[in-house]
Amino acid sequence: MRQQFLGALIGAAFGTVFVLVNSGDPLPSAIGWVLRALAVVALAAVVVLGVRAGGRPTLEGRPMFGPSYRVIVIGEVVLLVAGFFVLSLLDAPVQANVAWIATVVGLHFVALASAWKARSILVVGVVLTVLGVVGLALLGSAAAWVPFVSGVLSGVTLLGGSLYGVRRA
């Protein structure tokens, strides 16, 4: 399996989870189910396009999942755990968790864009980070919408970025 396809598949899988988990209230039920179905279709499209692309090399032979990737993922885990701890100390609403996850995952992609010298994922990273920060800002006034803003829209961003990446491969 090509490394770039594996990366797109991981992004699409997490994007699908973001949409599946966060497409509930305050969205109308029918819209939530449509969003969930579209996310699954997008994930399937990433799989089909990735398999059809075959074994073409990517990233000019550089390893995607080398030492820099591992350092970034370890940093991501530390930030997630520390952030959840701080949010619990602050008695933040449960919706804060998805906003924090989106923020940290966005920063993860920004760091990966630099490590991999792949500007295409920088856009995904910046958008996810912004959606996470907006979700955190909404906690004081519209917490019910945080799962949509930081969850569903982040999932759509990951799925779109994965489709873009696998089409370019």
Where are these regions (language model features)?
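The first (N-terminal) embedded transmembrane alpha-helix
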Residues: 1-22
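Core segments of transmembrane alpha-helices
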Residues: 10-14, 73-85, 127-129
